[in-house]
Amino acid sequence: PLKNVTVDVYDRMLVYPGGIPFGVKLHTQGVLVVGIAPGDSQSPAYNAGIRVKDIITAISGKPVNSIEDVTRIVESSGGKPLDFTVTRGDSEYIFKVTPGWDKNENKYKAGIWIRDSTAGIGTITYIVPETLQFGGLGHGICDVDTGDLMPLLTGSVSDVTISGITRGRIGLPGELKGYFGAEKIGSLVANTHVGVYGVLKSMPQNIISEPIPIALRHEVREGDAVLYTTVDGNTVGQYSVKISNINRNDGDTKSFIVTITDPRLLELTGGIVQGMSGSPIIQDGKLIGAVTHVMINDPTKGYGIFIETMLANCP
């Protein structure tokens, strides 16, 4: 019975398709270890057992969420051991780190490189009319060095104006270039492996469609569809694409293949480029999903995610 309930909810659901670029600033919960100081012997944290990809959540019982938090505690330690609370996968560990004296900089250090935030551009997939909740990107925001999903503490959403394009070539994905608007237009509430989710303060002016139904995965078919995306300023364009290789059992970010067939888009971008992730795909008047990845060896092709998967993971 549970399955039917889910289907009924989605059957009646109407959403605005997006295609609108947005800027994300994400601050992590805890700080992410992205590197070890050169020469492992000089890294007290490494010697204590801390590794790249670990997330440091507290030091000697004090929560840490920024590089400044960690630096302040380590530098004022006087070289006494500190208890680093670390999340690794699903487990939590405590490592006793004794900061070392750096004679070049005259201060105590733990010997690790850490990161506490990131920023980037993506595309909004859908907006729920009643609540202004949105989903976008169709994949998670991951750390550039470790490839791991970044744990979200807080995040803000800005509008973005697309100011240029680096065209995609075989072996070298292109990208949309843009600048963030001064105003925050919303906030992020979740960063998941199938997309980012948040709430907007108001309905964007550049929506180009009334709310439309969503397609369940069994309704998605091979053949023609339309991609909504923004490649110039903040005007959403509609471009023809083809859907193929549908894997209905896939609950992840590569559920079908999207091929760009529109000569205008191919001319402008060479195909799918970074920044387009989350661009909604409409087929038979329904929102079927979003573009998630470009194929490195053929930028005219990429992968898509079912809208059903994105909605199922919405917090």
Locate the predicted segments by residue.
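PDZ-domain C-terminal substructure recognizer with occasional recognition of PDZ-binding tails
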Residues: L2-Y10, T71-G111
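Signal peptide-directed extracytoplasmic domains
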Residues: D8, R12-D40, Y46-N47, E92-G100, ...
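Generic structural signal for buried aliphatic residues
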Residues: I56-T57, V70, L82, K103, ...
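Envelope-exposed proteins and targeting segments
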Residues: K3, I20-F22, H27-L32, V52, ...
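Hydrophobic transmembrane alpha-helices and their immediate loop junctions
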Residues: T87, S91-E92, Q133, I282, ...
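PDZ domains, with a preference for the canonical peptide-binding region formed by the helix
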Residues: A58-S91, D298-T300, G304-T309
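Conserved PDZ fold ligand-binding element
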Residues: A45-E68, I281-D284, I288-G289, H293
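Serine endopeptidase catalytic core focused on the charge-relay Asp
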Residues: G100-G270, Q274, D284, T292, ...
